[in-house]
From Swiss-Prot:
Single GO term (MF): ATP binding
Gene3D superfamilies associated with the record: P-loop containing nucleotide triphosphate hydrolases (3.40.50.300)
Protein name: ATP-dependent helicase/deoxyribonuclease subunit B
Family: Belongs to the helicase family. AddB/RexB type 2 subfamily.
Chain's gene name: rexB
Record-listed E.C. numbers: 3.1.-.-
Record keywords, A-Z: ATP-binding, DNA damage, DNA repair, DNA-binding, Exonuclease, Helicase, Hydrolase, Nuclease, Nucleotide-binding
Assembly notes: Heterodimer of AddA and RexB.
Stored InterPro entries: ADDB_N (IPR049035), DNA_helicase_suRexB (IPR014141), P-loop_NTPase (IPR027417), PDDEXK_AddAB-type (IPR038726)
Keyword set includes Nucleotide-binding: yes
Role played: The heterodimer acts as both an ATP-dependent DNA helicase and an ATP-dependent, dual-direction single-stranded exonuclease. Recognizes the chi site generating a DNA molecule suitable for the initiation of homologous recombination. This subunit has 5' -> 3' nuclease activity but not helicase activity.
Amino acid sequence: MSLQFILGSAGQDHRTPMVTALAQQVTAHPTDQSYYLVPNHIKFETEVDVLSALKEQIAPEQALFAQTQVQVFSFTRLAWFFMKNEPIYQLPRISPAGLNMLIYQIIQTHADELTIFRGEVDRPGFVSQLATQLAEFKVGQVTAADLMSAIEQLDTTNTDLQAKLHDLMIIYEAFETQMMGKFVENTDLLNQLATYLEQQVDLQHAHFYLEGFSQLSAQERQLVAILIQRSASVTVALNLDHGYPQKLPDKTTLFFQSAKLYQQLYMVAQANRVPVLIDQQAKTARVSADLQALDTYWQASQTLSPQPSAVEKPTHIQIVQAANRYVEVSRVATQIRQLVATGNYRYRDFLVLTRHLDAYQTVIDPIFQAQAVPYFDDADIRMADHPFVELLNALFDVQRRNYRYADVFRVLKSELLLPRDADGELMAVPAYRQALALTENFVLKNGLEGQHWWTQDKDWVYNRFAVGDGGVQTTRDDQISAQINRIRRFVKQTLPPFFARLKVAATYTDAAAVLYQFVANAGVSERLMTWRDQAIAAGDLTKAGQPEQTWAAFCDILDEFHTILGDLPTVLPDFQALLQAGFAGAKFSQIPSTLDQVVISESGIVQANNRKITFIMGATADTMPDNQIPTTLLADNDRQDLSARLQQVDDGTYLRDDAATQLAGEPYLNYLAFMSGSERLIFSYPAMSDDARSGLQLSPYVARIKDYFGLSIDIAAANPVAEDEAILPFVGTRRTTLRHLVQASHDSQLREVPLSRSWLYVLNLLRTDPTYGELTTKLLGSLSYRNVPTQLTPDIVTQLYGTKINTSISKLEEYYANPYAYFLKYGLNLQERDVFALSPASTGEFFHATLDGLMKLVNDQKLNLAALDDQQLREMTDEVMAKLLDTTENPQFAILESSHRMGYIRQQLMKTMRQMAKTLQEQSKRTKLRPKRTEVQFGLGDERGLAALSFDVGKRRQVTVRGRIDRLDAVQVKDKTYLGIVDYKSSEHKFSYQEAYYGRAMQMLTYLDAVKQNLPTLLDAPTAKDAELAGAVYLHLQNPILKAAEVLGEDPLTSLLKAEQYQGLLLDDPDLLTNLDTLFGTPDYSGSSLLFRGLRRTKTGKITSYGKLLVNSNELDLLLTHTERLIKRAATDIFDGRVDLAPFREQNRTALQYSPYKSVMQFDPLLKENNYRDLPSLNKDDVMARIAAEQEQEATDEHEI
């Protein structure tokens, strides 16, 4: 028996003296057994390396070498080796999924006994967190009895920790009881192995070699203690400057953990009278001279010892700054590829580290794939994110939430459940996807939520009824109906029977059987195997293993349901939660697909030291040192208190280090990463965060290294520069190099500089490449592409619009906002997907229909609105709304009955309409204007409607404008009739001369023009001859909320009228204005109108306005003529094929703000050819002057013609 330590820094070669000792032992005692123990993470690589090194020392001349007396194991593999035939090893191995399930069941069973954990079981991640805590107790040799003793010793003031330990003790005790004799987990095996080796195995001819450990858990330490006591020899390699048999160094020193382990093992040997041989120093350097200098510096920098003199600027240590993580990973992958291309390296010579891989997970794969660099990413992949697990969760959610749209389509979009045809074959995926997309559109458009829609006997009927269909059901509609009903029937025939069987499952075993039979019979396993085969065909072996592993985990979980919960009565919510808890603890096991590949890993875990070059990415102040401490159930202060009490009970028990101790170990963890490569070390970091909102700082560790060695920071450019000759960072595979060539060529074009000779050489190579030549020409040709729409040909215009445009004025307003958007929407008829929702248009329709119905009802009953009492008014308003909300007559308002939320909105809409009815009544009492007609249509073919506005625009082409006027008011003054327009709006509107001039707000003027053109129809001949337009105003339909300050000192009704005033454009005619507000007819009145915002009567009796509200007859004619000119100009441009990409910009508003076509237009203001059409600010005088000048110029042009 003996204990031997081999000591040295991480830059020294520990492996060679270890293998030398092993070779001597094998040669001297060929029948003895030797075991080389390393952390599980590096077992495979170490086995290959150790056996290769052993061959060189024992049989260098042999072509083949085998050694049965030497085994390379991890601790868990050592347990398998010795105990594989023992009864304990034959017990069912409980998986992490089953562990979560068992803990969940224990919490539910003991809920009445628990205090603070009782309500935590449904919190995401809690069960896994609790499983981790119990595993920590196991590894730390802490029993439930130890927790009880600790509780008794705790200070009574620490009630929170007492409550936690109380619950943990109950759960842990139940857990140990449930596990005993039924299951075994990996954390149990080491204890069993220690007992087994101590009691049943003769280790006198066994030799153990430990490498790669800096600290051991209580379980591992107990096991190693048995090995020291009973084996022939134990040799331990440690990263340590010298031995520490008595006094430990300070906790902040670099090698504290290794020194502590040295002392623990030394004391075990001393206590058992096992000879401790003289420490052997690892004297041979494993790393290059530059890395040796870094090793020396880093050791000295962690102590108060003098700093060593700086060496010459090292060439094998490098720091690279990249613009972002994408550029950073691209630089790493490119450099690896280039170094392998030299012939001096293999891919396996590279190790890429970062502290947290999740920050790089989305960019590593596409970049390394693009650079054709084989790699193995050893980051854990959660099984809970697999589509099969999502399918299982969605299935239960469909049942629990009554076939909610999102849940049903989560099931269907998993593509694991597919309909079968008459021959039993699964539906082809492309056809299924098309049918599913159509079904989703149909469901969204019609708001089909709930089981009854999916399980009804009657088929769904699809009807598009778009413009031009004439309401006729087409063959295409029938085909779509067949597709969507195939999906509906599939849901009906598949899900309800499953839910019915699950509902009557008496026990958890029954429920597990029902679930298994359902997914098996539905062809889910077939689909998973199809995915596996597709991944194998694509060469993605990592992804290929996931379907089988997920299915195997699913089967194991169901087996554990039977074993753990068995005959307990089924509680379906718990069944789903247990299933989720099971998968929450499962991870995919990953196996390298080839020996020659780059390893990508995290710097916080031990790495094999057989690499030549290490890249450390993400070397920022946020992660080096790392400040992310895993969240556990026990806070640091709890951990310290409990550890102290446990040490009093049994000094062989301890917990994981607290946050302060972990942070103190950061220099050592990073030191191991620095020394992991033998030749070079390359740091890199992104200058910007992922969201590009904040800058990232270089790690203080790397900054110290930089300053000490006088290193400069290399900048990894995001894009190449056209004239640069040093283009190596941008040269990788042909495809990735082509991407950078395009970027360089674009830079050359923008800055008008020639491409460098290096880029021209690359250009020539790619153009003549048989595979990429055509693509090179095509992509470089894109540089001459300009994002400018091509004017439409006359034939296309005729096919799209014919020779007559029938339009509304709002559509022409859209043309003036952005001609190209008009073409997309009304030329190509591109539409967004219909969604069952209460749109502003639907709300407006309800408002308009209610007020129109109220006015007609009042007129039909020959009543005077102003004379109605409140009860009559409310009854009549409610009568109108009741008819409107009858969904058999008006299905467009069915959405207001679709949910409780919509029911609330319906009540709010009705309140608004009751208030507006009251407003209209009060307004009618205060003005002589009276509604003449409501919902006056022009150009829509209504018998009572008015003629459309029609204009010839040359070449036998015509534009016809149609519309609907909400309300037409009239007042008779001195034998003259004035007609005015009221337009109802659900939001605040004001008349803008500027917007009217630019064609952005033509509605009111167009409606006035329609009234003017149709005066003979609206009035009898004598009256029409002298009639004038009164103007056009907006009325905001609302139920206003008044502030206290607004109603103090005046009648509340007056305040309400002020909040609901008309505003718009009025004719500046004293006779008219006097009759607009009865207050103005009062001789002594001076002040503002209650009805029309901005209108006031002065003390002299003159009626004026602020905001340029009033226009005279000539100005109104100018505005109407200009509007007609805008209509004809827009029509002419449309017929001429003008589809300019010219969105307006007015102060902080643009035509693109709410456009659904941005992805189609690809408008980029940074491009020279893409420019906003800026609209200069104009006031009324500016507008009138411009219109007058334009009319004068037009008249001059016509005269000259």
